[in-house]
């Protein structure tokens, strides 16, 4: 399967989700973004951090890691930013490629098989 996107974010942890949301705030259309996450859900390591202390700066309240990740996940879903879970990036190449894209990403998952992603 070939996919073309303006922005591809490798990793759906808090930084990846924040990058996607920031791109939308800067005018990038959500459908021009793709988040690739190897785990079963967005949130990264925060899903394992059950202690409080997250979110004071961003959400103005103290949250556990899973709560913080869930807030970001809901924002990503509300903006309809596409993402692929259980997706492992196998290769990333730079340089002008197909149709003038700068990056070629090879990834795979059980649902789609081999993915050729151009960004």
Residues covered by each model-derived region:
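Beta1-alpha1 glycine-rich phosphate/pyrophosphate-binding loop at the start
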Residues: 5-71, 75
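Feature captures the FAD/FMN-dependent oxidoreductase FAD-binding
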Residues: 64-119
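Phosphate-binding P-loop
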Residues: 2
């Amino acid at each position: 399967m070939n996919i073309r996107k303006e922005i591809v974010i490798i990793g759906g942890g808090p930084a990846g989700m924040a990058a996607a949301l920031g791109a939308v705030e800067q005018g990038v259309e959500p459908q021009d973004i793709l988040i690739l996450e190897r785990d079963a859900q967005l949130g990264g390591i925060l899903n394992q951090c059950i202690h409080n202390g997250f979110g004071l700066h961003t959400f103005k309240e103290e949250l556990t890691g899973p709560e913080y990740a869930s807030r970001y996940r809901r924002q990503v879903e509300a903006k309809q930013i596409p993402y692929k879970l259980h997706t492992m990036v196998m290769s990333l190449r730079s340089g002008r490629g197909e149709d003038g894209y700068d990056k070629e990403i090879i990834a795979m998952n059980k649902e789609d098989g081999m993915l050729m992603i151009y960004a």
